[in-house]
Amino acid sequence: MMITLRKLPLAVAVAAGVMSAQAMAVDFHGYARSGIGWTGSGGEQQCFQTTGAQSKYRLGNECETYAELKLGQEVWKEGDKSFYFDTNVAYSVAQQNDWEATDPAFREANVQGKNLIEWLPGSTIWAGKRFYQRHDVHMIDFYYWDISGPGAGLENIDVGFGKLSLAATRSSEAGGSSSFASNNIYDYTNETANDVFDVRLAQMEINPGGTLELGVDYGRANLRDNYRLVDGASKDGWLFTAEHTQSVLKGFNKFVVQYATDSMTSQGKGLSQGSGVAFDNEKFAYNINNNGHMLRILDHGAISMGDNWDMMYVGMYQDINWDNDNGTKWWTVGIRPMYKWTPIMSTVMEIGYDNVESQRTGDKNNQYKITLAQQWQAGDSIWSRPAIRVFATYAKWDEKWGYDYTGSSSTNPYYGKAVSADFNGGSFGRGDSDEWTFGAQMEIWW
């Protein structure tokens, strides 16, 4: 069809608008999960996690609606040089009602500049809040190396035999105290900045299909002028990480060894807590501290076993040994096999076991959890999402110890400490029981 002169300006404007929209297209990524569930003994879905464990087996065992919404855009590009702006807002509600208001968490807001340094081709300069090179076990939602937060860095520097990355990030915690000479008042609820300095050397090919990553993190409490720390605060600490990744059976296996000291032992993933530990809304911190060390040995992966079977797996031993005897020994093992009936329908089972020993009491808490789910997903991989699943979960536990949060830290000398289940005639931990739940859930990442 011939375009008249009158219509030509409109056609040009529309075409220009389309090209402009494509050039300025915004990247939309994210993650979300939500569903509905019931408990066999009555009421809404309960979720099961062993006291003292830092995570739980998640299939058929998530009781909240959670979402991360990421918007990003390459805002400038010239040759191989570019600037990218990235954001991430997260939400979490209890999925109990239609209208559930919550304050969003601003997780990411950063700019990444690629190839800006002529003599470091392939490297990236970045600054802002960021999820920084996180390492996790998906099936237990456990992040074992994660220094995310506000920060800055230079990453992916090619050193010939690997990629070097340097970063500094920050997290804050209650525990720092402001002192006033006139009345000697201490307010332990003030936040104290903790800085983490991270060095990583990754992508070192050491065997066919295998790579090695090494990392060192140093964390320290960074006090303002006229501030002091609670007595016995650890102040600083180190985390050393070695991770070997092997390509195997159309998937991967990761073997990880980590060792941490003092302020880096509480979370054990690279974030520092060096100012002491405050509980809830206490007016001053309980003088517990995290001086000591942590050892973690972890193996996890995901593999394909023929055309119809995929499987995730994890095995981990973690020993947090604190000078105050409030540490734990935690070991966990689990598998998640998946049988694919069609390219979009599968049956998934998850079996997981946790055992946590209290350093103080010597008692042990244990739990095993089994989930069977029928699932429809967008593809034939165990990683394919979105997925809609119906599930049934059975959990049985036997807990011999718990943490004493009776009263307050000012009145209870055992506040925050591990105690036996029947300590002082009380009831700590979850006892010896079992339960089953059932429901439906969607999960998506894009």
From Swiss-Prot:
Main localisation: membrane
Positions on the Extracellular side per record topology: 36-64, 94-104, 131-148, 174-191, 223-234, 264-290, 324-326, 360-362, 401-430
GO CC aspect terms: cell outer membrane; pore complex
Domain of life: Bacteria
Topological domains annotated Periplasmic: 26, 79-80, 116-122, 160-161, 206-209, 249-250, 306-307, 342-343, 379-385, 446
Any single Pfam family the record assigns to this protein: LamB
The reaction(s) this protein catalyses: beta-maltose(in) = beta-maltose(out)
Site (Greasy slide, important in sugar transport): residue numbering on this chain: 31, 66, 99, 252, 383, 445
Keyword field: Cell outer membrane, Disulfide bond, Ion transport, Membrane, Porin, Signal, Sugar transport, Transmembrane, Transmembrane beta strand, Transport
Site (Important in sugar transport): 143
Transmembrane segments: 27-35, 65-78, 81-93, 105-115, 123-130, 149-159, 162-173, 192-205, 210-222, 235-248, 251-263, 291-305, 308-323, 327-341, 344-359, 363-378, 386-400, 431-445
InterPro entries to which the protein is assigned, alphabetical: G_neg_Bact_CarbUptk_Porin, Maltoporin, Porin_LamB, Porin_LamB_sf
Induction per the UniProt record: By maltose.
Membrane topology category: Multi-pass membrane protein
Signal peptide (from-to): 1-25
Example of a GO biological process term: monoatomic ion transport
One annotated GO molecular function: maltose transporting porin activity
Gene3D superfamilies: Porin, LamB type
Entry's family note: Belongs to the porin LamB (TC 1.B.3) family.
Function: Involved in the transport of maltose and maltodextrins.
Subunit structure: Homotrimer formed of three 18-stranded antiparallel beta-barrels, containing three independent channels.
The protein, known as: Maltoporin
Organism from which the protein derives: Escherichia coli O6:H1 (strain CFT073 / ATCC 700928 / UPEC)
Organism classification: Bacteria, Pseudomonadati, Pseudomonadota, Gammaproteobacteria, Enterobacterales
